[in-house]
């Protein structure tokens, strides 16, 4: 009979594999704890377990195999409550110090399939080894789990606990991969956010100049020509200032309320009548008539004769520009020589209805129109009375090195 039961065990295990139980691992752990305690109590008495196993419903007959496979929980609960030693799982038999274990208890119930799936030949081999090592120290439940999991093939780990462990390990690997990707992305953004380090460029702050260095900049731009151009532009100013110191007569062109002169008038300065200052006779500060015959000019009236005096510095760069032919013009497009020298300076051009001279340029010193300026012949006393510069103060600016 025992041999017949042993032969029928593979069928039982195959049916158990086809119908795995759906029991919680937590309930199984509680059952194992009760089972281990139940085995430790009767260990002192060597009472045989055969009469109990005959009454146990866990050893199925061939006719009861499909019923037990579908309802493992119904048979398990009464067996634990009535006979606690009737559930001889493989792990519990290892923990108990029983010397003689019958072969009838080698049949694995359906609830043990959650932890391990073994064939009938493996169970026989392990039973023999358990009988030989019955006097040795029993293994712990955790060590048995580890040894069994190493010996089993991968396809036998079909329990819910193994699936949970596999799922947790996969999730951890995925999270680690995402963390590594995030670190790589942050490194790439850090490198792209600093293109200056990749290209070797350096950023330097820009500060405004503490003092203007126009003369030095002009020298660097024009080099040797700078001194000649400046001397030509201001030579008349220098000569007029030195002549005023010698004679005591300061001739200037300015707006009436100004304390400084926009231009100093010298011998090469031109009058509105078209003649130079040296062609006029200075009688008093209010009488400077023209000496040229048939000229009706009774008072010298300054008019710019160079494009630099009206701020048109670019005209000299033109190839067809003639400095001697340049004349200041009115808004009527006629020059000052085509207007009357006296009075409001009406236009004398045939067909022009211009009643007075209105300049189409501005003063390079004050940005005001020509008609807003006047020509003054001042003595040293009148300059002192008006608080305007006199003596060497008028030439102090020209002694600075260029």
UniProtKB/Swiss-Prot annotation:
InterPro entries: Fam221a/b (IPR026755). Residues 1-35 have a biased composition (Basic and acidic residues). Pfam families: FAM221. Residues 77-90, 393-402 have a biased composition (Polar residues). It comes from the Eukaryota. Signal peptide: none annotated. Residues 1-205, 378-402 are annotated as: Disordered. PANTHER family: PROTEIN FAM221A-RELATED (PTHR31214), PROTEIN FAM221B (PTHR31214:SF3). Belongs to the FAM221 family. This is Protein FAM221B. The gene is FAM221B.
């Amino acid at each position: 009979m025992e041999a017949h039961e042993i032969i029928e065990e593979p069928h039982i295990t195959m049916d158990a594999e086809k119908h795995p139980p759906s029991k919680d691992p937590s309930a199984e752990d509680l059952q194992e704890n009760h089972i281990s305690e139940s085995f430790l109590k009767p260990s002192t008495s060597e009472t045989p377990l055969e009469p109990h196993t005959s009454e146990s419903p866990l050893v199925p007959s061939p006719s009861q195999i499909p019923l037990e496979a579908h309802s493992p929980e119904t048979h398990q609960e009464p067996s634990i409550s009535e006979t606690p030693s009737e559930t001889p799982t493989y792990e519990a038999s290892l923990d108990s110090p029983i010397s003689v274990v019958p072969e009838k208890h080698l049949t694995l119930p359906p609830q043990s399939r959650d932890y391990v799936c073994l064939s009938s030949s493996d169970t026989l081999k392990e039973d023999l080894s358990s009988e030989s090592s019955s006097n040795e120290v029993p293994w712990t439940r955790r060590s048995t789990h580890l040894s069994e999991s190493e010996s089993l093939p991968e396809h036998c780990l079909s329990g819910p606990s193994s699936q949970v462990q596999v799922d947790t390990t996969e999730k951890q690997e995925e999270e680690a991969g995402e963390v590594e990707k995030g670190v790589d992305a942050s490194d790439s953004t850090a490198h792209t956010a600093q293109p200056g380090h990749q290209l070797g460029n350096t950023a330097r702050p820009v500060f405004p100049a503490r003092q203007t260095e126009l003369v030095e900049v002009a020298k660097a731009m024009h080099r040797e020509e700078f001194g000649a151009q400046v001397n030509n532009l201001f030579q008349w100013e220098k000569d007029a200032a030195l002549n005023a110191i010698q004679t005591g007569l300061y001739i200037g062109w300015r707006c009436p309320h100004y304390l400084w002169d926009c231009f100093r008038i010298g011998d090469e300065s031109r009058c509105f009548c078209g003649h130079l200052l040296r062609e006029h006779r200075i009688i008093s500060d209010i009488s400077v008539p023209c000496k040229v015959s048939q000229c009706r000019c009774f008072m010298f009236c300054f008019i710019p004769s160079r494009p630099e005096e009206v701020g048109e510095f670019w005209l000299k760069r033109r190839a067809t520009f003639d400095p001697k032919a340049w004349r200041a013009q009115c808004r009527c497009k006629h020059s000052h020589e085509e207007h009357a020298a006296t009075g409001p300076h009406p236009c004398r051009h045939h067909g022009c209805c211009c009643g007075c001279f209105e300049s189409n340029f501005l003063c390079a010193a004050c940005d005001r129109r020509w008609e807003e300026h006047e020509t003054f012949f001042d003595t040293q006393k009148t300059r002192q009375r008006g608080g305007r510069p006199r003596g060497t103060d008028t030439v102090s600016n020209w002694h600075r090195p260029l």
